[in-house]
From Swiss-Prot:
Residues 1-29 form the signal peptide. It is found in: Secreted. Keywords: Repeat, Secreted, Signal. Gene3D superfamilies: Gnk2 domain, C-X8-C-X2-C motif (3.30.430.20). It holds the Pfam family Stress-antifung. It comes from Arabidopsis thaliana. Belongs to the cysteine-rich repeat secretory protein family. This is Putative cysteine-rich repeat secretory protein 35. One of its GO terms (cellular component) is extracellular region.
Length: 258
């Protein structure tokens, strides 16, 4: 069963389960959830058979990943050569590093195996992380991927002056870009993340944005996301743009760990 929940043309539908996290619930509940959001199987990379070299390389790499502390919330690792090589890219949300990141990775790798059975490549998004698995080793730093993106919005409309709300929201997001695009070094790894809140009359706006640690031009990516918001989220109380390179979200309620 599918909803008409807003998605970009690049990824057309999202299961109705994926919108549950956007419904207003208690802050403690939101902080504990890690909802599945979306996925895409890279069909062009082919499939593997049980026991072949690709599966062995994937298992070796997965075992290695599980041994990392993931303090910086990011991982880009490869194993093997040629068509049987495996690359894993993991980016955890800025408030979900360390053990929370490892937990999200475990959820994501299991979800990938269920939803992209025997596919050699694909991407899967959860609330607290996204995971890319591929036979292709991208040149580093990675270029911005504008193709594999999608949008989601809060089902509730802004009750008054939606145009003014949209403008103030985007003005605030552009200010956050300045902070997010300036790297913070965690465990020798650059992280690009910012979160903030802003008073809007009697209500408060909460927002976050983040770039994958291995991409070029974080600022360009985040500003592109902001320009995409009118296509999905005008007049809505919350919205988000997600992709392989960067993502952002805003709501009228807190949704991050403190």
């Amino acid at each position: 069963m599918y909803s008409s929940y807003s998605l970009s043309k690049r990824l057309i539908y999202v299961p109705i389960l994926a919108i549950q996290f956007l419904l207003v619930r208690s802050v403690s509940s939101l902080n504990l959830t890690n909802e599945y959001l979306n996925h895409k199987c890279f069909v062009s990379e082919g499939k593997y058979k049980h026991g072949d070299k690709y599966e062995n390389n994937l298992n070796v790499l997965n075992k290695n990943v599980l041994s990392y502390d993931l303090t910086s919330g990011f991982l880009h690792v490869s194993h093997g050569e040629g068509p049987d090589s495996v690359t894993i890219i993991l980016q955890c949300r800025g408030d979900s590093f360390g053990s929370n990141c490892r937990s999200c990775y475990t959820t994501a790798i299991d979800g990938f195996h269920r939803r992209c059975q025997r596919n050699k490549g694909g991407i899967i998004w959860y609330d607290q992380c996204f995971l890319v698995i591929s036979t292709i080793k991208p040149q580093l730093p990675r270029k911005i991927d504008f193709k594999n993106t999608f949008s989601m919005h809060n089902p509730n409309n802004v009750s008054s002056e939606p145009g003014s709300f949209d403008k103030m929201t985007r003005d605030f997001l552009y200010k956050l870009v300045q902070k997010a695009s300036y790297p913070t070094v965690v465990e020798h790894q650059s992280t690009y993340y910012a979160a903030g809140e802003k008073k809007l009359g009697k209500r408060k706006l909460y927002a976050m944005m983040q770039c994958a640690s291995d991409i070029l031009q974080c600022k360009v990516c985040l500003e592109w996301c902001i320009r995409e918001l009118p296509k999905c989220c005008d007049g809505k109380q919350g919205g988000r743009i997600l992709g392989m390179s960067c993502n952002l979200r805003y709501e009228l309620y807190p949704f991050l760990r403190r």
